[in-house]
């Protein structure tokens, strides 16, 4: 029936209804009534419109399925966070494969992990997961979902979030978002209380996570899909029972041991100097100054100028410099830093080398705060001028130091830490000493003042020789500042001072490829028999998805009359990579060891560094101004040819990068090349 069937004019309604006749007092003659034959009323006229086939406003794009499809589940166990007391400010993802020093705590208080197919394959090589189906002879893949299971800890609570919106890049403010207090204020989060906090709760929580929001449900080549990020999991250890003050603490404030910037005016103690020069806190320091301290448990008076300038026969030109910064008696030795009195010819002289400050995190709103790296190679105290990544402004100290050390470690080289130290500017640090420093505070660990390494580790010979403040002797104080923040575990002087967030993941993929026909068949009667347990299953063979090239496989169209075509064999020979494990020994140097893949956030500067160099090289002009004589014409031609080859190489690099970005857009738009 048409759609207007229920709305049509119902002409039979009221057919048997007669109006009630009116009665008059006087009888009138009946009017002649002629009965007409009943006739069906005419149908309502409608304007007939011709049917026109119009185009659809939307179009459904379909993709042909591969001939062979198998469901693969990648199951494994992982630890998003693990660490110990003293590492709350660090990211455990960066410390995963680091070699921790003896007696040093490892790990971190939060973790940010990126999962991709390439990372899952790297974990399979480490025997950290299993693949239920092999991806051999399967060049296509589809990502379906991920099921994460989080297991509760005995004493430590956790806050977990996940993100499905790429890109996952890092800047100097990224890790602050993963502070436990910041995660608790998010709208969507997973709170995993410990067994002590919630004794009657379930021991685990399960969460099903969908694919990235802009990813299409279609088939992709494994080689292109392997390096793309699928999921970001971030978690932080927190304390729901003692959010702001620990169970064994008297108050929230912490004490900072800082270098007195009025005494240590020069910051060039890392620069070597030849005799007769050596490091001095300031240029006009009196050589006869005596430092009075209780070093070694008794009152001692130490004249450092006399000890440094006492030359020993046979010493080199750098002997005075190394004595001025040595642990035995330099300007940063315990004899100087523990001094409670300085005098010149029995007259008290100020300022003292160390100043104590008290930091109150409850009133710190970040206004006017600055955290920056100060060089120890030259100059005086001051803000960095050229590198904006070396400074953080307008952030509370307990939040600004959260993950900042690992950010510099990832984006810069680790060699910057022996040449710099952290300095803060904050009005929320107060002191009661009369010789107050300037507006900035160069803090150091108390163990450095006592002449010890952090966590009582062994002092090496180079450390005894170069005993001066660096970032390495500030980590305990940085952790104490971060511990003063809200909801950070405060486990100092406690027995249970470690944590670990154990997780189980199950990534669901579908592998697709050609249907393998014409498989070899042998006579079963000629098969050999050997003893083997029937219950043991043979392990699956897994191929690196990044090297699983579609052009190296035989498909149905590569067979003709039961034989492989010559075109298919030629295509495979051109695209088949050589396995480095099968190469013969040679006299050439071995290839450098490949760096382990870390599931960390991406640095956008490193991504574009090579491309920027190629673009700059295209704009370079030849600066050769030699006269064109017969002798140097050949040299000029060779230089021009080399420059053309370099330009050609840079253009190929740019085109390759453009194609990679186009393939990345295919994950979101589905546009084929």
From Swiss-Prot:
InterPro entries: TTvirus_Unk (IPR004219)
Keyword Cytoplasm annotated: no
Span of the signal peptide: none
GO-annotated cellular components: T=1 icosahedral viral capsid
Pfam families in the cross-refs: TT_ORF1 (PF02956)
Origin: domain of life: Viruses
Main location group: virion
Region (Disordered): 575-595
Keywords in alphabetical order: Capsid protein, T=1 icosahedral capsid protein, Virion
Membrane-spanning residues: none
Stated role: Self-assembles to form an icosahedral capsid with a T=1 symmetry, about 30 nm in diameter, and consisting of 60 capsid proteins. The capsid encapsulates the genomic DNA. Capsid protein is involved in attachment and entry into the host cell.
Recorded family membership: Belongs to the anelloviridae capsid protein family.
Protein's recorded name: Capsid protein
